[in-house]
């Protein structure tokens, strides 16, 4: 029956007898409460639900948990509960305690599997209240990760499904795992730019003057120098950059890096001519090369390179990267183009301030100093185990590793503008190129001619050396360091023993002074220094380096270097005199004073107006190189590599004596470590095997000696006017550098250079062989060096 039909059947009498109204309900019956009292429970962002509520629990169970905070290294067992609003972690399953971690489901932006641990997944949450992912560069900083590991694979998938179904920002599809991303790295001749390069590498290449032709000739070498530059400049290369390096045949790099620049180098030069000091260096740092004149090329700045090689790259996401930074980064004062290159160094040992002096001498018995040095090296140095090679087992001396000096310490002479449409010829095989020695040099010819062989490391034949991961050794405690330091120093205030004449400079770790000895310190029975070790006279001038130990990142290496220098006495090595521990934080190191200054100063002040004229005569060069070679032979006989031979580290005095200084880069070769593979030194003097990060031995010093010879001939080392990145590339690809004016040189010096600068280490001469070379027969007398020091008067 319809409603209208039912209404027609009702009459007016049906509503006359209404009856009494029902009683109202009691007050307790009305349980309605204002809605505002429950608004906080409806807010998903508010921290409610501190206690577990059985009615809200959707899934729970025991898991292992760690976050990216202070305890990121520790996995903790927690009881995890997932409800409609939160993902919560508790210490127990009782339900009575507060949550240790409570993540609103609205803030979870990503959930994905992770290889950090077995059956592990990562929950990424946004710190933004709205939960929306942050845009721009700051997006990563507003996100935090929580890593959760379950007992079984089944539990892992169950938790992933449950979390995905509850999080409003997730689409229900997890992020991909174990994926690869293939990119192509190459050079586009139409646009004149590199394709597929990481952004930071692309920026470096843009200002490095590495051209598309360089890339086509040897892409692996370009990748190698980019990888070196990137890692030593910024700490760690990006995953894409690492993959690009692997695709181009460059050796893989370990993630742990050691960076430092707060070193102090004591060069015993005449103080009156010393420029102001800057940064952490204790000698004036050579300024960057002056930028070359702009070169006009025909059509394009990049040579046409059609069909340039494209390198297939497979990138894989990196799970964990770690950078270890020692000291603060300091940039040298410079005005040239490479101002983005701070003095950095990576080595398996930590950084220290070089004391700038000699290294240990040969002894028939193991002295107490050597015995202490052996114990120090075993406990304080972090070394890589390389394949053993039988050598005479010497006393173990650990290397001392200050920061890598990527800039030389002198201003490069200005070059005239090069007219014409062609760029400077920096490729091997130029008209004046020295013959690149890949085999034994021919003694009959000895001429330095054009290259006849393909440069080592050509594309398609990468010869990367696989490196073992370094094993970290425990460092000494501060108490142990101070105990060992007290054993090799005078534990007294040296102020009454010296008169400070002049301050040479100020660095991050201390100061260098020119001083005059007033008296010999009294014998101290509590000191490990004997009275007969003091070989200086009253009234002599000395160089004193005051070091602040608290500013040294690796104090044990300072102890190691002092021990090395104490055992060094050679006529061609700057001698260590004594050391004083004034306080627990104030160390004074007294060294021999060389009034003639560095060879760099001599070269700079001997350059004439004629660019083709050598700053020094060949007899003078032969004498200086011979004296330096004698000092190197002394070190090499003790299986010690200097690793930073250059004009800055060779000092002269007014009597014509020549001495090597700055042993901050020295390394000891032992029966277990017959070769090294770390890149240290100054790039312009580096041997090709060092730039390519291959294993090397004492012959890297012979290469540097040859470069220093060219430095005395031409006023500067090869490639000094190039950007450091381009210089590294040219060293790696050209090998033996070319001479500017080979027609002006004698046959003897060209033969000498050919055996020093032989790319194949097997045929490169040793210091013993060099000392018998006919070039040294032309050496002048020491008195003839006096003309080189006239500028100091």
Swiss-Prot record:
Q: Where is the composition biased (Polar residues)?
A: 258-276, 312-337, 355-369
CDD domains referenced in this protein's UniProt entry, alphabetically: CRIB_PAK_like, PH_Cla4_Ste20, STKc_PAK
> What residues sit in the active site?
644 (proton acceptor)
Domain Protein kinase: start-end pairs: 498-776
The EC designation for this entry is 2.7.11.1
**Molecular function via GO:** ATP binding; protein serine kinase activity; protein serine/threonine kinase activity
Query: CRIB domain: which residues?
Result: 173-186
Keyword terms of this UniProt record: ATP-binding, Kinase, Nucleotide-binding, Serine/threonine-protein kinase, Transferase
Q: Which InterPro entries match?
A: CRIB_dom, CRIB_dom_sf, Kinase-like_dom_sf, PAK3-like, PAK_BD, PH-like_dom_sf, PH_domain, Prot_kinase_dom
> Which GO terms of the cellular component aspect does the record hold?
cytoplasm
Sites where the protein binds ATP: 504-512, 545
Database matches in SUPFAM superfamilies: PH domain-like, Protein kinase-like (PK-like)
* Residue numbers spanned by region Disordered: 8-27, 243-369, 383-476
Ranges for domain PH come to: 56-168
From its record, what is one biological process in GO terms?
Answer: intracellular signal transduction
> What is the protein name stated in its UniProt record?
Serine/threonine-protein kinase CLA4
The organism named in the record is: Eremothecium gossypii (strain ATCC 10895 / CBS 109.51 / FGSC 9923 / NRRL Y-1056) (Yeast)
Name of encoding gene: CLA4
């Amino acid at each position: 029956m319809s409603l209208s039909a039912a209404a027609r059947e009702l009459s007016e009498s049906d509503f006359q007898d209404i009856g009494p109204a029902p009683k109202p309900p009691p007050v307790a019956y009305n349980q309605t409460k204002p809605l505002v009292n429950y608004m906080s429970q409806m807010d998903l962002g508010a921290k409610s639900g501190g206690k577990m509520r059985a009615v809200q629990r959707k899934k729970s169970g025991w898991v292992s948990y760690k976050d990216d905070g202070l305890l990121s290294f520790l996995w903790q067992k927690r009881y995890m509960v997932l409800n409609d609003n939160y993902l919560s972690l508790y210490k127990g399953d009782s339900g009575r305690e507060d949550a240790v971690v409570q993540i609103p489901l609205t803030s979870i932006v990503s959930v994905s599997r992770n290889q950090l641990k077995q059956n592990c997944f990562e929950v990424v949450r946004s710190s933004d209240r709205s939960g929306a992912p942050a845009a721009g560069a700051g997006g990563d900083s507003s996100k935090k990760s929580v890593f959760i590991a379950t007992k079984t694979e089944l539990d892992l998938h169950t938790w992933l499904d449950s979390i995905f179904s509850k999080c409003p920002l997730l689409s229900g599809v997890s992020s991909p795992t174990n994926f690869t991303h293939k990119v192509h790295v190459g050079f586009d001749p139409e646009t004149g730019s590199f394709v597929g390069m990481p952004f930071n590498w692309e920026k470096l290449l843009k200002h490095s003057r590495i051209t598309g032709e360089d890339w086509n000739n040897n892409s692996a070498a370009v990748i190698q120098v980019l990888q070196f530059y990137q890692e030593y400049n910024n700490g760690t290369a990006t995953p894409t950059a690492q993959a690009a390096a692997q695709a181009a045949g460059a050796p893989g790099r370990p993630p742990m890096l050691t960076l430092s620049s707060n070193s102090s180098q004591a060069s015993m030069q005449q103080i009156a001519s010393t420029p102001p000091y800057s940064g952490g260096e204790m000698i004036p740092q050579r300024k960057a090369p002056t930028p070359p004149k702009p070169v006009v090329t025909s059509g394009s700045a990049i040579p046409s390179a059609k069909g340039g090689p494209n390198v297939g790259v497979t990138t894989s996401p990196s799970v964990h990267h770690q950078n270890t930074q020692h000291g603060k980064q300091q940039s040298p004062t410079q005005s040239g183009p490479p101002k983005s290159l701070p003095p950095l160094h990576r080595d398996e040992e930590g950084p220290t301030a070089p004391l700038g002096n000699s290294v240990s001498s040969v002894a028939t018995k193991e002295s107490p100093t050597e015995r202490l040095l052996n114990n120090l090296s075993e406990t304080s140095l972090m070394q890589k185990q390389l394949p053993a090679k039988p050598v005479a087992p010497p006393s173990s001396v650990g290397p001392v590793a200050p920061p890598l000096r990527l800039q030389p310490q002198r201003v490069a002479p200005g070059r005239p503008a090069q007219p014409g449409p062609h760029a400077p010829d920096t490729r091997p095989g130029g008209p004046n190129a020295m013959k690149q020695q890949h085999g034994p040099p021919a003694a009959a010819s000895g001429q330095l001619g054009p290259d006849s062989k393909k440069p080592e490391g050509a594309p398609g034949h990468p010869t990367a050396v696989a490196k073992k991961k370094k094993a970290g050794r425990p460092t000494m405690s501060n108490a142990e360091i101070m105990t060992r330091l007290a054993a090799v120093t005078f534990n007294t205030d040296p102020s009454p023993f010296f008169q400070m004449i002049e301050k040479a400079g100020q660095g991050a770790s201390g100061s260098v002074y020119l001083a005059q000895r007033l008296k010999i310190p009294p014998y101290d029975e509590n000191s490990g220094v004997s009275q007969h070790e003091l070989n200086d006279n009253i009234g002599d001038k000395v160089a004193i380096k005051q070091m602040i130990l608290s500013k040294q990142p690796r104090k044990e290496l300072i102890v190691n270097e002092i021990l090395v220098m104490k055992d060094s006495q050679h006529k061609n090595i700057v001698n260590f005199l004594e050391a004083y521990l004034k306080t627990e934080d104030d160390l004074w190191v007294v060294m021999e004073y060389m009034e003639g200054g560095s060879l760099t100063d001599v070269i700079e002040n001997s350059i004439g107006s004629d660019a083709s004229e050598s700053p020094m005569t060949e007899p003078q060069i032969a004498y200086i190189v011979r004296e330096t070679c004698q000092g190197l032979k002394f070190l090499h006989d003790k299986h010690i590599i200097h690793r930073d031979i250059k004009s800055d580290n060779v000092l002269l005095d007014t009597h014509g004596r020549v001495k090597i200084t700055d042993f901050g880069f020295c390394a000891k070769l032992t029966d277990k470590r017959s070769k090294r593979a770390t890149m240290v030194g100054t790039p312009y003097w580096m041997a090709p095997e060092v730039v390519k990060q291959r294993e090397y031995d004492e012959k890297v010093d012979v290469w540097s000696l040859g470069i220093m010879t060219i430095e005395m001939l031409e006023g500067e080392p090869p490639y000094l006017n190039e950007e450091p990145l381009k210089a590294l590339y040219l060293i790696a690809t050209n090998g033996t550098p070319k001479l500017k004016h080979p027609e002006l040189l004698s046959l003897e010096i060209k033969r000498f250079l050919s055996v020093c600068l032989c790319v194949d280490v097997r045929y490169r001469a040793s210091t013993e062989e060099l000392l018998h070379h006919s070039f040294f027969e032309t050496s002048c007398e020491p008195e003839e060096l006096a003309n080189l020091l006239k500028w100091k008067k």
